[in-house]
């Protein structure tokens, strides 16, 4: 216990006791001010109750002065103890007074009928002060009234009656046995620490966070997909990725740019009987063949090859120029032809049918590559390969150079042995993903995602298609938890999974820093409507963008509030005051209130339900999660957090 907390607990108690002990006898001094017998009697009785009333007033003043303090609960306990002591002093004094003539009381009357009314009044005041102090000690700053307009519901709600989803209803919607952690079932804005800023290194600012029941999603309604928006440093990994990785029981694919999640949850998932694989460029010996799923489970090889080529080639959700479209489309066709030659022509051994071989065949000098294309056209056993190669056999050198440069640029990351090893290995196969027992953590850092986005697209796309081609024939569901998903760029396969993934056992949980990231990736303002329409739930937290705050405010709806108006008029004959009430429209939450939300608070939208305002499930606040989590390689660099947590 710190010195401040000791002072907050001891000082009000000592002050209240001191006043209760020092003021008795003041009734004679007060009575001397009376001019008549009645006045002296009244002032004397006021003096009898004054020590206890003054003690109660001191306690209340102390609580009001400490309002907003981190240790307000400690002050509440101190005032409650002081009130108890004052009541005890009053009872002892009155008991001693009554004991002096207890033997003279008639048998028909009770000794309690002689209790002094003034003392009873003072004691009752101290009792009420103690009850309020106990309320403060239990719920902290939430015990004080909040300044907000009176909301109107029912027939008088002319401007709307939007309201927050009630927590019991939220508990039914997001049952605790679900696998995707959405948040915690408590209202941060009504918590004891609502007036304080959230600090991860100060447990006294956490309030009910970490002690409340979880809100979890089981994929039972909607598309089963979720989208999370939280700014940089907004505890995305802490409150979404790690808790979900601890709780999800099925196949889990995590895009982990910080390589932070896998070391923390790997041991827990292995204990749960899961096979955990970490794809890390620093360990290229662990990898899979990104082409091993082609043509399996009813899919055509030609379509699957075209899909792989499209992941390697970067694509934008926005319209581009005709020249750019031509060279991109031609480069895509050339890459498709080379991949098809490796997989379909029949001259490449099965074990060598990898993207590394594709890059080796493609990265030849132009004259040699043109000769290879002619040879492929003449000798390939596949009509599909011949038809795709035919366009390049007699292409003019200038045009072919542009197409060749485009294809080389998009596949240059395959020249890095550590990157090529991840998608050309044999440690596991994509069939393992669909078996329902394997988890994969894709630990590509932000620099790699920014420079070589095709690598992540190939990995995620291969896993998605391996499940998609099975037509839903897999145990349970596979969760693709994609942190920093904007770094993947535009992926049409994600749009396919968004629209039809539920049928095939695919659930997406995508984490963005802002709505702007989504719009930039998927093509302007229409992107939000496409993705929001297909999401079962959408979470917003740690918002710093006024435009996003305005969107949240509008989506939450409006309420009807009652406003008191007072008008005064002054005339020669006197003055008058008129008081009236009127109804006005007010947003359920205003944009500036969204921007001022605590970092551990979020707003969750679901289709057909009121917006949910709740807490966030940060793993370091929950004892059940802390016991399962391994070491975080970043916490040692953050100072107080790893000492307090």
Each model region followed by its residue ranges:
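Basic- and hydrophobic-enriched, low-structure N-terminal and domain-boundary segments
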Residues: 2-14, 18-241, 582, 644
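Glycine-centered flexibility motif
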Residues: 131, 183, 346, 456, ...
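Short alpha-helical interface patches
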Residues: 132-181, 186-193, 304, 310-312, ...
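Low-complexity, polar-biased intrinsically disordered regions enriched in Pro/Ser/Thr/Gly
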Residues: 189-215, 317-326, 347-348, 563-582
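P-loop NTPase motor domains
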Residues: 209-210, 217-223, 227-506, 584, ...
């Amino acid at each position: 216990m710190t010195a401040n907390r000791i002072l907050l607990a001891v000082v009000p108690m000592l002050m209240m006791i001191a006043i209760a002990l020092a003021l008795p006898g003041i009734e004679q001094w007060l009575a001397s001010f009376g001019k008549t017998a009645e006045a002296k009697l009244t002032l004397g009785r006021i003096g009898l109750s004054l020590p206890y009333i003054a003690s109660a007033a001191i306690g209340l003043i102390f609580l009001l002065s400490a309002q907003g303090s981190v240790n307000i609960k400690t002050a509440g306990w101190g005032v409650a103890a002081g009130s108890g002591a004052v009541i005890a002093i009053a009872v002892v004094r009155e008991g001693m007074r009554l004991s002096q003539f207890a033997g003279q009381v008639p048998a028909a009357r009770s000794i309690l009928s002689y209790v002094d009314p003034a003392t009873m009044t003072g004691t009752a005041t101290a009792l009420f002060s103690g009850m309020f102090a106990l309320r403060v000690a239990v719920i902290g700053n939430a015990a004080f009234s909040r300044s907000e307009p009176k909301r109107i519901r029912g027939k008088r709600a002319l401007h709307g009656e939007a309201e927050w989803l009630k927590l019991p209803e939220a508990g039914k919607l997001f049952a605790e046995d679900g696998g995707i952690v959405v948040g915690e079932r408590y209202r941060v804005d009504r918590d004891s620490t609502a007036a304080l800023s959230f600090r991860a290194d100060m447990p006294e600012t956490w309030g009910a966070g970490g002690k409340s029941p979880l809100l979890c999603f089981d994929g039972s309604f909607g598309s089963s997909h979720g989208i999370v928006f939280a700014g940089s440093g907004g505890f995305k990994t802490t409150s979404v990725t790690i808790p979900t990785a601890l709780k999800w029981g099925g196949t889990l694919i995590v895009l982990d740019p910080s390589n932070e999640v896998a070391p923390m949850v790997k041991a827990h998932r292995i204990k749960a009987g899961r096979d955990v694989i970490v794809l890390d460029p620093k360990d290229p010996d662990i990898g899979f063949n990104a082409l091993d799923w082609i043509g399996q489970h009813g899919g055509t090889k030609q379509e699957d090859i075209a899909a792989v080529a499209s992941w390697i080639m970067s694509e934008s959700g926005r319209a581009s120029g005709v020249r750019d479209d031509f060279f991109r489309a031609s480069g895509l066709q050339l890459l498709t032809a080379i991949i098809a030659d490796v997989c379909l022509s029949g001259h490449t051994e099965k074990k060598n049918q990898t993207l590394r071989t594709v890059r080796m065949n493609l990265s030849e000098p132009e004259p040699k590559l043109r000769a290879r294309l002619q040879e492929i056209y003449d000798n390939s056993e596949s009509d599909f390969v011949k038809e795709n190669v035919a366009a390049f056999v007699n292409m003019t050198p200038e045009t072919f150079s542009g197409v060749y440069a485009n294809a080389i640029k998009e596949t240059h990351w395959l020249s890095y042995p550590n990157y090529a090893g991840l998608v050309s290995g044999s440690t596991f196969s994509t069939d393992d993903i669909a078996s329902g027992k394997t988890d994969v953590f894709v630990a590509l850092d932000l620099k790699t995602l920014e420079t070589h986005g095709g690598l992540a697209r190939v990995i995620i796309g291969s896993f998605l298609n391996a499940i998609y081609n099975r037509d839903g024939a897999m145990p349970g569901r596979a969760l693709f938890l994609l942190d920093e998903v904007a770094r993947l760029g535009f992926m049409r396969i994600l749009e396919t999974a968004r629209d039809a993934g539920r049928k095939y056992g695919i659930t997406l949980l995508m984490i963005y820093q802002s709505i702007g990231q989504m719009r930039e990736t998927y093509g302007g303002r229409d992107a939000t409507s496409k993705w929001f329409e297909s999401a079962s739930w959408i979470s917003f937290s740690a918002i710093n963008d006024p435009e996003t705050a305005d969107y949240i405010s509008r989506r939450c709806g409006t309420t009807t509030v009652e406003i008191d108006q007072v008008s005064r008029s002054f005339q020669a004959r006197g003055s008058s005051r008129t008081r009236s009430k009127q109804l006005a429209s007010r947003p359920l939450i205003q944009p500036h209130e969204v921007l001022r939300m605590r970092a551990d608070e979020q707003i969750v939208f679901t289709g057909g339900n009121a917006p949910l305002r709740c807490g966030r499930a940060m793993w370091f606040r929950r004892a059940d999660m802390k016991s399962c989590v391994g070491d975080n390689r970043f916490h040692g660099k953050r100072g107080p957090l790893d000492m307090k947590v």
